[in-house]
Amino acid sequence: MRKYHSNIMHKIITFVSLLWTFVVCDEISLHTSSSPPPLSSPVPVLYYNLDQSEIYFKHFLQQYNKSYDDPKEYQYRYNVFKDNLNKINSQNRENLLNNKNNNDSLSTSAQFGVNKFSDKTPDEVLHSNTGFFLNLSQHYTLCENRIVKGAPDIRLPDYYDWRDTNKVTPIKDQGVCGSCWAFVAIGNIESQYAIRHNKLIDLSEQQLLDCDEVDLGCNGGLMHLAFQELLLMGGVETEADYPYQGSEQMCTLDNRKIAVKLNSCFKYDIRDENKLKELVYTTGPVAIAVDAMDIINYRRGILNQCHIYDLNHAVLLIGWGIENNVPYWIIKNSWGEDWGENGFLRVRRNVNACGLLNEFGASSVIQ
């Protein structure tokens, strides 16, 4: 019996050791590659030695060209940074254990690490870099309501990504402005234009910040209301004609420069992920809402563990796939190419990851 217990303990210790064998402290440099490693290759898990926090912090300040004039602010940001290192370690450990419990390959596990948000508290990031404002959901909308549920009516492929047919515009960065609602609305329109006209076009988010009379600019909004407002404005200008400023300005809409006009829009009550696949496949990328709490530190891989209770961020669902038998969604974010998988995120499918079934989706119909 003693030998049996000894073997069990040996197996437990071996497994725990395996989890922390993937120690890559020198990857604090981050983003040194213009693209993530092959998604099918084993992904090392970062573990930050908290005793080295000050070294990591100085490296972080240098890499992201940050400084603080006030010594108290420096100390505060350093303490926040240390808290985030601890959070990152926990996220890496929890996702590995979740993969183990699901009998999933360790290579698919999400990897978290230091990024440009690492000197900010989660609340600061959610306040300044998201912008899905659910309180506006009771506002009247011109968009048609549709329920997304039931079995798909067509056979769907195991993998589909609108990027493969050049129907998704490059990643953008909303900056320190709660304008995700504008970016996802414009991203949807850009993809709809590419699907209809086989051409990518860069459209203006700033027009929505300045001229939308229902949404709240950098204080948040909703994507279907953005579609409605663009319908009433007569369309949207290009980014070149109405460039992004990252803050609300006076409306300077010029109807002579309208580049894309909308015919209508839809607000979707999403209740089934398989039916959602069909919607993305037949309609194009769909704007959805998620809880961004657990994606702040995301670097790559398929996210298993994800907070689902407070929808606060709008993103664009552009496809799906399966890696090592793990089904996932592909999401386009608006936090720049230096976040995540070159600006994109993958989350596990069929588990309501990040609360993507908790509210609604939206899409536009263009001329």
From Swiss-Prot:
Glycans are attached at residues 103, 135. Residues 1-25 form the signal peptide. Disulfide bonds join 177-218, 211-251, 306-354. Belongs to the peptidase C1 family. The active site is at residues 180, 313, 333. This is Viral cathepsin. Cysteine protease that plays an essential role in host liquefaction to facilitate horizontal transmission of the virus. May participate in the degradation of foreign protein expressed by the baculovirus system. InterPro entries: Papain-like_cys_pep_sf, Pept_asp_AS, Pept_his_AS, Peptidase_C1A, Peptidase_C1A_C, Peptidase_C1A_papain-like, Prot_inhib_I29. Synthesized as an inactive proenzyme and activated by proteolytic removal of the inhibitory propeptide. Its EC number is 3.4.22.50. It catalyses: Endopeptidase of broad specificity, hydrolyzing substrates of both cathepsin L and cathepsin B. Residues 26-156 form a propeptide. GO terms for molecular function: cysteine-type peptidase activity. Keywords: Disulfide bond, Glycoprotein, Hydrolase, Protease, Signal, Thiol protease, Zymogen. It holds the Pfam family Inhibitor_I29. It comes from the Viruses. It is an enzyme of class 3 (hydrolase). PANTHER family: CYSTEINE PROTEASE FAMILY C1-RELATED. One of its GO terms (biological process) is proteolysis.
